[in-house]
Amino acid sequence: MRSIIIASLVALALASSPAFERTFEPKTDYHYKFDGLVLSGLPSASSELSQSRISARARIQAVDDRYIHLQLVNIRMAASHLPESEQMPSLNSMEQRELSEEYKQMLELPLRAQLRNGLISELQFDKEDAEWSKNMKRAVVNMISFNPIAPRNEIEKIESSYDKEEQSEENTSFFTNEKTLEGDCQVAYTVIREQKKTIITKSINFDKCTERSEIAYGLRYSSECPECEKDTELIRPQTVYTYVLENEELKESEVRSLYTVNVNGQEVMKTETRSKLVLEENHSIKSHIKKVNGEKESIIYSSRWEQLVEDFFKNGDKAEFAPFEKFPLDKKMHLIKTITEQIQEVENNMPETSHFLARLVRIFRTTSTSQLKEIHETLYVKADKKIQSLMEHALAIAGTKNTIQHILVHMENEDILPLGQILKTIQETPFPSQSIAEALIKFAESRVAKNNLVVRQAAWLAAGSVVRGIVDYKNIRPLVREDKRELKEKFLRVFMQQYKDAETTYEKILALKTIGNAGLDISVNQLNEIIVDKRQPLPVRKEAIDALRLLKDTMPRKIQKVLLPIYKNRQYEPEIRMLALWRMMHTRPEESLLVQVVSQMEKETNQQVAALTHQMIRHFAMSTNPCYQRVAIVCSKVLSFTRYQPQEQMIASSYAQLPLFLQNSFSGAQFDFAAIFEKNSFLPKDLHASLDAVFGGNWNKYFAQIGFSQQHMDKYVQMALEKLESLEKESTTVVRGRRIQTGIKLLKELAQKMNIRARPATYTEKDAFAMVYLRYKDMDYAFLPIDRQLVENLIEKFTSNGKVQFSEIRRLLNQELEFETHHAAYFYEAIRKFPTTLGLPLTISGKIPTVISAEGQFSLELEGTELRLTVEARPSVAATHVYEMRMFTPLFEQGVKSVQSVRAYTPIKIQAVAGMKRNFEIVYKVVVPENQKSIVSLTTRPVVFLRFPGFSKFEYIEAEERTVVVPQWQQKTQEIEKVFNFLGLEVSTRGNILNQHTLENWLLAEQDFEVSVENKNRPAEFTARLTVGQLEKTELSQIKYNKIFEKEFELEQENTESRREYFNKMVKNIQKEQGYKSVISLKLEAPRDYTMNTELTTVCDKQVRMCQWEVEIRRSPILEETKEWTLRSQLLVVRPEMPSSLRQLRDQPHREVQLSLTSTWGSQKKSEVTVNAQLQQSKEQKKYERNMDRQFNGMPEYELLIKAARLNQINAVAEYKLTRETEQVLARYFDLVKTYNYWTVSSRPENNENDRVVVQLTVEPMSRQYVNITMQSPMERIELKNVQVPRVYLPSIAQRSVKHQLTEASGSVCKVQKNQIRTFDDVLYNTPLTTCYSLIAKDCSEEPTFAVLSKKTEKNSEEMIIKVIRGEQEIVAQLQNEEIRVKVDGKKIQSEDYSAYQIERLGESAIVIELPEGEVRFDGYTIKTQLPSYSRKNQLCGLCGNNDDESTNEFYTSDNTETEDIEEFHRSYLLKNEECEAEEERLSEKKNYRKYERDEEQSDEYSSEETYDYEQENTKKSQKNQRSQKKSDLVEKTQIKEFSHRICFSVEPVAECRRGYEVEQQQQRKIRFTCLQRHNRDASRLLKESRQQPLQLDDYPVSFVESVKVPTACVAY
């Protein structure tokens, strides 16, 4: 039964075909009424639209079963601005438009069409017909092209679905592919039969097209954003056909198409086309339509005209056809002359100026080479400077082959001067072609370019950018894939030849930047060869990595395949690896690749590489950039599984992102910053700061980027500065030279004794290179190379015969010139064209024509010690953003556009004077000229426009424009009109401006806002005078302190009196000493006798223990004030004495920092506030010091002292008397803080003292990332608990100077203790030290500066002797009678004389010896050598390693040979002589040598930061020599047991094996536990503290006792 039904359906389908083929009966003349309507406007029902209607009678003659003829007659046109309606407006309701006879005759030419299965398959037109006319006729026959019969595959689907549902015989629906006017796309048919009438509906799926006449220009600068594509599709076309048949005869055909522009998912513009064919009559043929025999063409819209225009733009006069030759030259010249005259009529740049620029660009694009030559000779040569400059830039913006060739010819003749600017504009040509690229390359090799490095650079970079446009995958025709391999190979050969011919680093980098701008995918292998070739200079290899940036979208996996091995290979330089990671992350890698990156990070030996990797992945994980959504999720996932924690370093490679994106919006910006450091340089190796922009889902990667890169330049600059420094008196040079030579001799003799081979520098002067580069729209725009030759030229210029030439410096600093400059540009231009169902092309374009001008005078004068700068300028700028949908045809032009214009004109005069007489003084003066107006205006408006005819050969036709006012958007603006006098200047603000700022609002709302500043009196001067006084001696007795303590500051009641007495005595002793005073004043003056004076007076003692700052500000009354406004404020800070030992810290009664602030301010009414504050230690921090029940000495004591002396709590009491307004403002700000921390705030009402606030702020001392704040106001008590903040720096009252803090934080440290050494690169190993000197660290360069040696005082002792050879001095130190004894060149020195020898005491029993770079700390048992992180990379030797940031190559022997044998390594640095015994037995025992892996790093050295194994620190006691190694492998921790609702802690610490060790022996012990509810705040606090140190819980009740197995010995396998 089923097969019979299916066969019947097939037979029915086949039977119906002939009937359908006879829709048009042969030998019959059909007369249809054709109506077409175009609507352009905003997507608002209430707004007006520009509407154009075309009406005609369409005669269709069916010659036979296959062919029809079509002719349009009685063609009429009308157009008006009308509100939208569903019905097609009548012709009488619109303004009638005249059609020229030429165009009417063109439209009346007939066509011949072939019908196959109801579809138009072939078309033939008259040979005289024009392309635009053909396309309009295609639109008519397109309305009769349909085939409602399902194809065979659809019939098979009917069979497969028969069992599932019944099929209606009347109604069918199916999909098929079909050629229509808009392309070869998938269409959906729905057929509904109603008695005698059949209604057929057809719609087009534009996402599934194989052919479409679409063209795009200027899109090559955007990157792919896959996450944005679905939600931010910019253009959404919709087309629906409706056919009505009666008795198989076509009675009516209608097609409606809607084309919308969308921003952030909202429609902002639309163009709609409606076409309708209605059968009026049919009869036998009486007069035949002329048969045409033109070439056979497709029904798909013909873009031949667009292709001819494009070919002309790209190839110029060599194009096959000149599409604009009909337009006479004299008319073009007349238009150009008219435009330039209109520009000149306006004194300053106005919004119209930018429109005139756009018109100039359009005209120049239509010109031939001969026409440009005539324009140049007739108009350009005779024009003034501004017009000439605008014409030059307009030619470059036009970007056609003819305009570019014209510019290049005149550049070679040196007729055009701003060569670099013009070439930069050519980089952005929207019509890149092979001929343009070849012309640029030819110019780059010309004489002019070779003589001017700036021009040569600009030409090559422009050539690369043009090549990118040619080969870019974002094709001009999206659905057409051209094979461009031959072109790619040709240009790659040219660029690689440029690279091979390069002789300098700069030339090689220029060649690579050219390749990078070109974005050639076939260049990957060549670039990879350069990256891995270590013979190439490092800057060249880095640039080769950067040259891969444009391939991240086209071949991300290939880039990852190239860069991942480079990142993972530790043999490559760290900066190469970090740049490889940087580039790889921008390919949006998959999880599988990121897992490998994280794995490498966890085992990475280079701290800089590991730190940058962690920061980069972390910031990508937090990114809100919509284009990185997938990457952010993956980065978060892989980061959650890593155990890696970056070390705290002050100078570390870093990466940061600042994404600024609105939620649920695909627009915003992202700022990226990256810095790459390495140990051989104190300057960053690379710095990048970039801005990415996303507008409506269009991603502009590297919209702007500035960067700095250098290699060895810091070394060379340092050498150059030393050369300048050497220009001293001859005698001084001789003496100093002798001393240096003596010191070097000592160090070289030591090297000879120990057979140390000098480590030559890995760089030479010629390797020094640096560059600053600018990147715009992902193109290398310009870069400035800085090499050895440039530095030498500068030195040579300003020195002569060993002396600085001050005359040259004065000549440089005494200049006077006048300037006039004009610049024009398109900040972007993007064009998309596609067909509509009326046969008219729709163009969607955007551009920002901008004109900038500035003229004035500049002078620089140097007189004695005074430098004077004067700039008088009159800058003006006009920019207009035009975004439009435009329907263009010779008959008419119609569309809608959004226009945003900005204009600014600000005449100004600036004077700056800097001088040093008695005081240092800077005077900065801004002068507003009299009778001149400064204006900043903003105008935005949506506009619909009509132009009839579309263009004329003989004149420019103005468009009929109408501003569209949409009430719903006007409600989002506010009217402002205000005029007021500000400091003698009349300021007026007028117009309306948006109060809700979104991109769509800016496109749709009408705004007209202007701010003007006018000076009608004499020139208005605004002066700022900064005076810095000299340091003067003063008496400290003038500092008064009265009530500085509050009752809330009392820490322990029983010690209050002694603490007060101690503090008062300390202050009185300080006041007896000499004080110093400095005064800084700032005076501001403005017209109308407005002044503001600020004076800051600082008084401090010599050691900065007590300081007082006084600020006094006075200013003239403003607004409603009637009296002078004043502020008087005094801040007193007293810090406690600096303890030198833990014992002194414990015994010191006063260890807090006291602050007292008194301030009074106001005009008629005064506000007063007095704040007393105390910076102190919290209870938790004090507990840290109290738990230290052992005696420490030397460096362990000092380091513990620093931590124990940290202040982590502030108590402040404020008594105030405020005005009502001030009190309300402060209350609002505090409410904001409470709201922001809503979940962590608790408050309760209290009745406290009026006009008094008590605040306590406590920083959690261990992690330093959580803050508790308690505030007590007159009416309430507020608490903020556990507020997370960035890691806080806690001051320590025992801290050394800022200089030493920086050295500690940013330097590399090597530590030697007992028989254990931790190297500069953080490698920990054991080696036996003996009574013979071992070389700890030495400068092993060819000109050494220091050496550090050490030996044991005697066998089996832990005490050591240190010897430091520093230049010409030999310093020996050792511990004797619990005090460090120091000898310099064999002579004992006393501690009071240390400073003369650059030695400093550290605590009570340690010293610091300064080195030429860094320092050495010694306490008799431990040696810590601290060097700057950049110091002597690969030129250090000794047991501390080479300080190269790599932990895998530490063991280089004295003869510079790498070894894995630690014994061999140690013996090479052993200095044997008759004074010592070598202890061969200890040196030969292998058990004395061991290298620790990372997991075993906690050994018997004391650990860093918060955890501290006190048991290992008391190195003074003799019993330490018998302490077993197994015991040292134990550590005590608080044992924790967690349950569902409670957490239990062991009351006393329990022994555990260290990480990396396993239990060897154990015993049962009964352990007491105390339990707390899990929700208890103390529970979470104790849980956190237990991770840092054992807890003391003796005061807590015992909850239960449990038997626990406790290890007594551990072993490492």
Swiss-Prot record:
Signal peptide feature range: 1-15
Disulfide cross-links: 1310-1440, 1332-1476
PROSITE patterns associated with the record: VITELLOGENIN, VWFD
Gene Ontology molecular function: any one: lipid transporter activity
Glycan-modified residues: 1268
Predominant localisation class: secreted
Traits of the deletion mutant: Simultaneous RNAi-mediated knockdown of vitellogenins vit-1, vit-2, vit-3, vit-4 and vit-5 increases life span, causes accumulation of neutral lipid and an increase in lgg-1 foci in the proximal intestine; however, does not affect fertility or pharyngeal pumping rates. Expression of transcription factors pha-4 and daf-16 are increased.
Domain VWFD as annotated: residue spans: 1308-1477
Key words of the record: Disulfide bond, Glycoprotein, Secreted, Signal, Storage protein
Biased composition (Acidic residues): 1495-1512
Record's subcellular location: Secreted
Entry superkingdom: Eukaryota
Tissues with expression: Expressed in the intestine of adult hermaphrodites.
Chain spans, region Disordered: 1491-1531
Domain Vitellogenin positions: 24-687
GO CC annotation: cytoplasmic vesicle; extracellular region; vesicle lumen; yolk granule
Function, in words: Precursor of the egg-yolk proteins that are sources of nutrients during embryonic development. Together with other vitellogenins, may play a role in modulating life-span, acting via induction of autophagy and lysosomal lipolysis.
Protein name: Vitellogenin-2
Organism expressing this protein natively: Caenorhabditis elegans
